[in-house]
Amino acid sequence: VISQQTIDIIKSTAPSLKKHGQQITTRMYEIMFRNHPEIKEQFDMSAQADGSQSTRLATAVYSYATQIDNLPALKSMVEKIAHRHVQTDVLPAQYPIVGESLLQAMKDVLGKAATEEVMSAWTEAYEVLSEVFINREHDIYEVNLDKMPPISK
């Protein structure tokens, strides 16, 4: 459960995310691929090159910021992303890598607006959202046992 204070802070960042979302997500991928090159093979690099992946992620992050207190409104988005994650063998252990990269990108792009309070709220909000995805993806893997990724990844 997300605290009301966190909800209020996240919602207050929505205008900045709308304005700078693409810049944040582009920066996130730069950070993530630099620090974790092994993860790159799971991504469609043509979608990286044309910016469509960054745009989709920016839209998803903005949607989460505006609907953080109404997660059922995000169900169709979560379903679509979770199924894509299953297709590309995303594992629970990769969520902290993405989270660390996203939070650093927010700091880099938002500068002084990324206060300790804002970053703490986004850390909490990301952890909650990653649990939603991890649980949903687990259920999808359970239904499709033949699609389970190798444990060693």
At which residue positions do the language-model features occur?
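Globin-like tetrapyrrole-binding proteins
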Residues: V1-K153
